């Protein structure tokens, strides 16, 4: 089975040891292509300290390690790349900071124009969403499945779908044209206490 999950961390990680244990557990599923560290309201030094431990696991399980918002941290950690929102720095500026051939992903909400612009500027992938209601992140943008069909037809680079995607609705998203599905709460806040069980449910 190919790797199709784009796993995003919880916004707050209080116990690093427990989290790292859970993270290694979900990596054994062998369906996670990307892991994005997305911690809010935390000092850069603490994010870097955690990132140094995470990268040992991502290398071990051949998962691309992506840092949210901050290419400087990505460079310090020697991560595979970073993910930028529309309010963050430009792709071209991020490219100057990161090592050559780094992955740079861009949030494009539900916009064909933003996606076209991102790929013109040599983005590695674009992320569309939210496709379903989500508690992970407040969003004022709603994306339709037809957007994925359009993107698949018009672009050769990867398309990531995000927003309320879970084990029950992921097939619709993949069938519509997404290369990867981004998930966070469906794993970390799952009713299933074992996050590996939650990840493996995506295989069915």
Where are these regions (language model features)?
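Alpha-helix-loop-beta-strand connector modules within alpha/beta enzyme cores
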Residues: 48-67, 93-111, 139-167, 200-204
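Glycine/Thr-rich beta-alpha phosphate-binding loop at enzyme active sites
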Residues: 32, 77-86, 106-155, 190-195
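Generic hydrophobic/aromatic pocket-lining and core-packing "Φ" positions
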Residues: 23-24, 51, 71, 91, ...
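Catalytic domains of carbohydrate-active enzymes, especially glycoside hydrolases
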Residues: 23-35, 121
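Active-site mouth loops of central-metabolism enzymes
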Residues: 2-20, 103-110, 160-161, 165
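Active-site beta-loop-alpha junctions enriched in small/polar residues
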Residues: 8-12, 40, 70-72, 87, ...
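Glycine-rich phosphate-binding active-site loops on the catalytic face of alpha/beta enzymes
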Residues: 7, 12, 84-94, 127-139, ...
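Catalytic cores of alpha/beta
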Residues: 65-81, 94, 110-124, 154-155, ...
